[in-house]
């Protein structure tokens, strides 16, 4: 078994690891997250910073997310405001831009990482979630980091935290779709893929796009669900797979599905309710902030099996390294 597939399958275990890391943090520190937070990261870590910023805003604070390089060199173009905390995210804790980003704002610094590292040592606070992935690409650590920090957000804002055992079991159930995903990639040799998501699922669509590029070296795009109708849909035809990430679909999702099918594309809907798609993966209804956790292992499996279909080794993605440094 490839290390990448093994790491995807560790998602349920990663949720439990995340819960232990959260509990250890709150036991050893009385720190509470403030209301105004800037999140930053690179690549997958940036796409992780986006749902964390959205969750902060949804829970009553104000979250802003931007890539480390933009925070370092172009932040005057972003609504950074007057944050009370900077959260820098890096799986290794050694990513050059993530470490340098800690110095970009004169506010308390927080590291979200998997290791005792340069990042954690330079930060004022560190939430270390020891996922210690073997895979080059970020897989279950994305989900674990998100869950651990979501727990900290809830606790800091005086809200009830999520049931880690239940969440872990839900990801285990999601992973049971592996065989169906393998069937889809075997049956339909799509030549491009478009990922769609709204709200907190939009950055998950972006992460899905990146996973497809990293693992399968494959052309993929991502858009806000209904924004795709405004020009972008022109690239979809009989060789296209459209992956619709939804929580609870409504009539617009069904209309969009038919629109793409009318262009010859096939649609895979992932969520709590079918849209009349060619393929459908049914997920249970959960709190909206938990939906990324259920979608992530599925889109990772889709990218993995597309890579296998193309005869590639997902453990050795071209031109990529586990830690990115200048």
Curated annotation (Swiss-Prot):
InterPro entries: GlcN6P_deaminase, GlmS/AgaS_SIS, GlmS/FrlB_SIS, SIS_dom, SIS_dom_sf. Optimum pH is 8.0-8.5. Pathway: Glycan degradation; chitin degradation. GO terms for biological process: chitin catabolic process. Optimum temperature is 95-100 degrees Celsius. Its EC number is 3.5.99.6. It catalyses: alpha-D-glucosamine 6-phosphate + H2O = beta-D-fructose 6-phosphate + NH4(+). PANTHER family: GLUCOSAMINE--FRUCTOSE-6-PHOSPHATE AMINOTRANSFERASE, ISOMERIZING, GLUCOSAMINE-6-PHOSPHATE DEAMINASE. This is Glucosamine-6-phosphate deaminase. The lineage of its organism: Archaea, Methanobacteriati, Methanobacteriota, Thermococci, Thermococcales.
């Amino acid at each position: 078994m490839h290390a990448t597939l093994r790491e995807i399958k560790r998602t349920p275990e990663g949720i439990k690891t995340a819960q232990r890391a959260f509990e250890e943090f709150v036991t050893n520190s009385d720190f509470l997250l403030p209301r105004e937070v800037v999140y930053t990261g690179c690549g997958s870590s940036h796409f992780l910073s986006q749902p964390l910023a959205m969750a902060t805003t949804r829970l009553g604070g104000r979250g802003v997310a931007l890539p480390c390089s933009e925070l370092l060199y172009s932040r005057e173009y972003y609504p950074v405001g007057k944050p009370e905390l900077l959260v820098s995210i890096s799986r290794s804790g050694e990513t050059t831009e993530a470490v340098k980003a800690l110095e970009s704002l004169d506010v308390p610094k927080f590291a979200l990482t998997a290791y005792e590292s340069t990042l954690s040592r330079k930060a004022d606070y560190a939430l270390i979630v020891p996922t210690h992935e073997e895979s080059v690409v970020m897989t279950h650590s994305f989900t674990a980091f998100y869950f651990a920090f979501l727990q900290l957000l809830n606790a800091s804002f005086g809200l009830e935290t999520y049931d880690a055992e239940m969440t872990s079991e839900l990801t285990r159930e999601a992973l049971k779709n592996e065989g169906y995903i393998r069937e889809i990639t075997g049956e339909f040799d799509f030549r491009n893929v478009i990922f769609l998501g709204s709200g907190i699922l939009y950055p998950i669509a972006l992460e899905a796009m990146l996973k497809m590029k990293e693992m399968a070296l494959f052309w993929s795009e991502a858009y806000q669900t209904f924004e795709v109708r405004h020009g972008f849909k022109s690239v979809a035809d009989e060789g296209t797979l459209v992956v619709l990430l939804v929580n609870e679909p409504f009539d617009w999702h069904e209309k969009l599905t038919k629109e793409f099918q009318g262009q010859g594309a096939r649609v895979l809907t992932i969520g709590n309710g079918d849209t009349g798609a060619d393929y459908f993966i049914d997920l249970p209804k959960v709190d909206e902030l938990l939906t990324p956790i259920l979608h992530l292992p599925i889109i990772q499996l889709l990218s993995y099996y597309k890579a296998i279909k193309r005869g590639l080794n997902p453990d050795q993605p071209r031109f990529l390294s586990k830690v990115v440094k200048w």
